[in-house]
Amino acid sequence: MGKLIKLITTLTVLVSLLQYCCEFNSGSISCERTQTLCHYTNPRVWNTYFSRNCELYKNKVSPGFDIVARKYDTAVKPVIDDATVKVNKVAIQPAFKVIHSQCKKWNCGKYYQLVRSPMVKTRRFFFAKYNAFVKPNLDKFFTAEFRSHLKERILKYKNIGHYYFTITSRCIKSKYDFIVGNTEEKLMGKFKNKDTHGIHGSVTREPSSEDMVLTVSTMESDEEELTTTSTQTVVETITLDQEEASAVANHAHDDEASTDVEGSTDVNVNEQALLQEDFDMWSETILQKTQDVIQLFEKDVSKYINGKLVEEANHFKAKFQSLDDKSKKFFSKISLAINDIECVEGIDSETGKKIFFDKSGSTEISQYITRELVREYFNETRSTLDELTNAMEKDLSEITDEIEKKVNAIREENVEVFEEWGDIIVNEWSKRMAYVDVINAHMGADDDTTLDEEKAKSSVNWKKFLKGKKQIIESRDKLAHHSADLSRVNAFRQKVQKKILSFTQESGEFLYILRSKANLQFQERERKERERKEREKAAAEEFQRQQELLRQQEEEDEEDVSYTSTSTITTTITMTL
């Protein structure tokens, strides 16, 4: 079980590295097998295949795969790309410089085969492109007469080259047999097997004096046997080529149009074969191009959103800091006012006006704290904080709209790129198919069966062409309606809104606490003022009562003095009498 897990882990790592290399070098992979390997090890390709062919997979597995793919593209891939760039800059490039400086001294002759292999692949690639795009255009300028003369010259120089090649090959084999081995037999076999029709039946003459030159310098029996074989091959080839040359000349003089039809038939067959092969790959090419454009769109959107959110996160951080500072300033102002509610009244000795001190009596305050003043402070704080939070919400909404507009612009740009690519592809394909139809209509084969087959192939190709064109249109609509991943934008917006709501709730609760504290302070001050007034009133009443009692006592004293005076006068009068 442990070995199986290790094997699965190793395969997973290898496939992941292969896919990363394929994606990183998607534009520079020229090997068809490598492209095929990259294609059939791509999880996205299999996901698309199973989604089209399995309804259960499409409903149950594909949505989860899409989520994982988006998370990889947005969270993992950027980190890997950055790490790759850093490693390439720090380690790989310096290492390549050192290796390059050492490789300058190497002799690369022994690596000929390593260089030859990609050159052969490149030659095959250009040859295929030549047959597909260049050769049809060249055939338009080469008439039948020109082709016949050109073919005669080619056959002539081919015979001469064949003759000298045989001599050179024999000399090389005689001197470097231990290196060359059986190269001559292989090469001569290619020339001999190139066209064996009618060779044995057409050779009737003996070797000429020119041909016998090849056997003059033979010294051993094995060399003589080999030389005889080579001479016979040359004679057969020359005889065949002369017959072909005479036949071509007769055709050129007798019927110029028949040669044109013959050449065009070959072109037609090649074009039909190429169309059949290319149509099989066209659908897959469109799907791959669609996936590439979608990946490019998601990559551009992810890159833009990352930069935009980082920038706006810094801006909102500064805004929240400013909001926090202003709120603390307002809260401090209200707290000082609440502390000064319980103030001490005094009289200015110079002006005689009332002045007020804090409850300790050591610091003079600017004004007497009233309910109206504190209420004004609360209203100012609440309105200012509401304006700031509303402005932040408005900015957040504008940022979201800006991101959506930019994403739509990126989508439209990628759709335009795909449309341009599709127009070029459709235009090129229509030209190729129209060219093949012209060949079929004007220079086709005389055989009715072959002509019907070509017409049937042309009809099938045009249907495939129409199907591919519709597929391009459907892919364009898919790109136009492909939804971007705005989850990070929504998360950022929710985070900011949550923080604004949290600040609003906290500031509201703190203002409520300050308001309650202010009410308690005012109630305490009003209670003390009522008690003071009651005491003053009671003291005034007591003072008035004392004054009344004092007045009454004075009146009673005055009455007593009057009575005493009257009694004295009466007594005096009586004694006098």
From Swiss-Prot:
Biased composition (Basic and acidic residues): 525-545
Annotated region (Disordered), positions in chain: 525-577
Top-rank taxon: Eukaryota
Signal sequence interval, chain numbering: 1-23
Cystine pairings recorded for this chain: none
Compartment annotation: Mitochondrion
Coiled-coil portions: 379-416, 513-562
Stretches with biased composition (Low complexity): 564-577
Keywords: Coiled coil, Mitochondrion, Ribonucleoprotein, Signal, Sporulation
Other comment: Present with 8640 molecules/cell in log phase SD medium.
Family: Belongs to the OSW/SHE family.
This protein's name: Outer spore wall assembly protein SHE10
Annotated organism of origin: Saccharomyces cerevisiae (strain ATCC 204508 / S288c) (Baker's yeast)
